[in-house]
Design a protein with these regions (language model features):
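Acidic, metal-binding active-site segment of PIN/NYN-like and related structure-specific nucleases
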Residues: 44-62
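Acidic, PIN/NYN-like endoribonuclease modules and their adjacent C-terminal/linker elements
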Residues: 1-10, 14-20, 31, 37-40, ...
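Short, flexible loop segments at the rims of nucleotide/cofactor-binding pockets, characterized by
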Residues: 25-30
Length: 111
């Protein structure tokens, strides 16, 4: 369901597994330090939504097809893994609505 970017702790996978089954961490599927385009390609191929704290993923630069996948951008600076997991769980329905969409972007929290 979700592909957690390496700027978020791998520990979150177990915390949110019940709500978001099939969630994986980047380091476990494409390796630490993988370029964003590799992460995006993996997400597209496996129907995953990228969860990241990297603002670059929000920008869909015309002609740059390398980051074409659905993204949840976490706008919580200097936060704990528990803070991110709570944010994701509290926004479960919004996140699950991204499935089946094309190039959807969701920034959380939305306020």
């Amino acid at each position: 369901m979700l592909l957690i970017d390496e700027n978020i702790s791998f520990r979150i996978v177990d915390i949110i597994a019940e709500i978001f089954p099939g969630t994986v961490h980047v380091k476990n599927v494409v390796g630490a330090g993988a370029p964003d385009r590799t992460v995006a390609a993996y997400a597209r191929k496996h129907g995953l939504i990228v969860v990241t704290k990297d603002k670059d993923w929000l920008e869909n630069v015309p002609g740059n097809h390398s980051l074409e996948c659905n993204v949840v951008y976490v706008k919580l600076p200097n936060c704990r893994t528990d803070d991110i997991s709570t944010l994701l769980i509290n926004n479960e329905y919004k996140i699950k609505e991204l499935r089946g969409q094309n190039l959807a972007r969701l920034a959380l929290p939305s306020r």
